[in-house]
Amino acid sequence: MRSISFNIFVLAYFLLLIGGVKAQGDAIYRSTELDSLKSLRLKSPQRAVRYARQVLNELNPEQLELESKILNVLGEIYVDLYLPSIALQYFIDAGQKSKVRKNPWNKINIGNVYFQQSQWLEAKERYLQALDMFRRQSGQKENSVIGRAVALSNLARIERNLKNYDDALVYFKEALDVKRGQAK
């Protein structure tokens, strides 16, 4: 009896172990797909769009975070293709699918859509929201530091386009200070 219990325990352990390895393998495979998509984005945007749609069709409903990331990359592709309406829709969808409800990079991307359309005040609002979110994150997190620098640089470009040159200079200097602080 004791031997049967031990055998069942060992069998259950191995099944769990195999299941964990498979799940980890699937996660690595999906991560590779995302990396491939990002690489394709720069080389062949049309091919990247086809690949992204294929991956989206193969996703399980519980893979919302990966779906959000793929939708975000699709939005970035459409920004690069100067199709802002389509890009904006993908960024909105990505934000809704994301587990992180306040994603500052999503705000940056939406701001980029408005910037591309010369809607300076809409873009400025999104960049300010992103900057606020990045400032609330732990200060030395690399992603947070880079995000603050990007938001500040984008705000400077907005102010330059609005011909508020003094404000633009302040934002550019602050962005430079953030980047210098990161280099230490």
Regions inferred by a protein language model and the residue ranges of each:
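Bacterial N-terminal signal peptides
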Residues: 9-17
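A "functional boundary" signal
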Residues: 20-184
